[in-house]
Amino acid sequence: MSLCVVGAKTLVLATSAFTLSWTHSVQKTLWEEHWRIEQGGLRIVEASVEGSGAGMEPGEGARFDGRFWRWKPDVPPLPELLLRRSDAVPKGWTLCAAGKCRAIADRAETADVVAARPCRDGK
């Protein structure tokens, strides 16, 4: 499977898993989500947040590891993730896959919304 990141340009990543992270605009703490690409869409396998507050409450069953609250969300696969730009978070989203991290804003250029979805025929 591959992941397509679609904005002003399309980026195709040959990977079966990826991590999406960002810094919360108010709390200034890190949020990470680990995703797997499946036939049915994108499945979140773990979420973690560095601290809590202002809309960043850890999920059900979360455990604190000394730095992060970690949990496994119980939700069905999603067909795509829509990632919006925010002036409150200048660095935006970071996507890591196959040992390399990329700032989504670097790929999106002028796109306000970037979609991440399983590739179908390279698109």
PLM features: residue spans?
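Mature, soluble, non-transmembrane domains
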Residues: P58-K123
